[in-house]
Amino acid sequence: MISMDDIIREGYPTLREVANDVTLPLSDEDIILGEKMLQFLHNSQDPVMAEKMGLRGGVGLAANQLGLLKKVIAVLIPNEPEVDEDGNEIPPKEAYKMREIMYNAKVVSHSVQDAAVEGGEGCLSVDREVPGYVVRHARVTVEYYNKEGEKKKIRLKDFPAICVQHEIDHTNGVMFYDHINMNDPWEIKDGMIIVK
């Protein structure tokens, strides 16, 4: 089981290195790695498990963050509950907006329009706040292989697009704060979407 102790922090060279494609068909080792990464995200989002294991909540994880130069990422984005007229929360019909283990993921096309998360981004490998808009593509098309070894192509927008770009960046040795304009961190570029 992956814990916070397994996640390397900024300054560790692997975070700045480009990961290698995993070999297809996938090895049992790589399939298990992806499953463990996804389980970590599940645990980090479960209040009881997160407290018990001392986990910070996360929606994505890349193998680089475990010190492994493999193009393996896991993404787990929960759906938010809806609120009825009386202000009561209604559980979402689907628990997750996105739940995927992606091998050799790459962005094959993207929008010209930019987007950024309203409050900026964070990272399990960064133990400090880095304020500012992390400017990314508003929409992306991503190709990857799933754990069954099937080639997939998906179109993403809004928060899922941002999350997957963050994780793919890790496999290319790029950190989220590389996308922040350090001279004007909260600059809103023309036409940029702010994702809440």
From Swiss-Prot:
Single GO biological process annotation from the record: co-translational protein modification
Pfam families to which the protein is assigned, alphabetical: Pep_deformylase
Cofactor note: Binds 1 Fe(2+) ion.
GO MF annotation, one: peptide deformylase activity
Cofactor: Fe(2+)
Residues reported in the UniProt entry to bind Fe cation: C123, H166, H170
SUPFAM superfamilies tied to this protein: Peptide deformylase
UniProt family annotation: Belongs to the polypeptide deformylase family.
Protein purpose: Removes the formyl group from the N-terminal Met of newly synthesized proteins. Requires at least a dipeptide for an efficient rate of reaction. N-terminal L-methionine is a prerequisite for activity but the enzyme has broad specificity at other positions.
Protein name: Peptide deformylase
Organism: Lactococcus lactis subsp. lactis (strain IL1403)
Gene for this chain: def
